[in-house]
């Protein structure tokens, strides 16, 4: 499963609020809710996030194996 915990850590480290992120990326509150819920996100949204935060994809998301026995 893909999780976005690193996004919130990166935002905190860079002192960027959710509102500022929305303004920089041009994303809506629905997209923020989807990120918080680790729901599907379009690749162009991921691109906007990386561009706005000046970071790599590994700083906003990670793969967590949820098939552990």
What do these predicted regions represent?
Residues 48-50, 60-61:
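Hydrophobic micro-packing sites on short alpha-helices
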Residues 12, 23, 51:
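Alpha-helical residues within the helix-turn-helix
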Residues 1-20:
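A short, Lys/Arg-rich alpha-helix, primarily the initiator
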Residues 15-33:
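Short alpha-helical DNA-recognition segment
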Residues 25, 36, 64:
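DNA major-groove recognition helix of helix-turn-helix
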Residues 9-10, 61-69:
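Short, charged recognition helix plus adjacent turn
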Residues 31-40, 47:
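Amphipathic, hydrophobic secondary-structure cores in small proteins
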